Amino acid sequence: MEKYIIILVFILVAIAVTFATYNLSIIRSMPPEERYKLLYFKDNQVSIGIGLVRRTYKLKDIREVRFSKGKAFRSMGSWAGRMKICKINGKTSRWIEFDGTVYYKKMVYITNEEIIDKSINILMNEFRSRGIQCNKYR
């Protein structure tokens, strides 16, 4: 029984390493200015995120995008922005969190409320330029 548990642990570690390697290879292959983007628009579609966790939506299926902000979970006072895609058929995405990386275009560790507001405005302008309604709450 102990052998099977050890084998299972090694298999899970191998899967985690493969997942991390795949995501890092995607990020490394991108040009530097593209690595820290949250939204990727292409062929009337928007992709959110990078790698295996990327979600793609057709622009014509999006009714609105909702934005909010709040204190980041388990942080020492850092703020996070949140975005939710609402589709025409009534379904909504999960809340997608982002930080000051959207504004600074480089990795940041602590973000204040002002930078989150600027990041939300950047994302709202990207959606509005493509004719999608955006609302900011709180």
Positions of predicted regions on the chain:
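Alpha-helical transmembrane spans
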Residues: 1-35
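Residues marking helix boundaries in flexible regions
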Residues: 6-8, 12, 63, 89, ...
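Non-transmembrane, membrane-adjacent beta-strand/coil modules in membrane-associated proteins
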Residues: 33, 47-110, 138
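Intrinsically disordered, low-complexity boundary segments flanking structured domains
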Residues: 43, 52-54, 119
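Generic alpha-helical hydrophobic packing signal
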Residues: 44-46, 57-59, 126-132
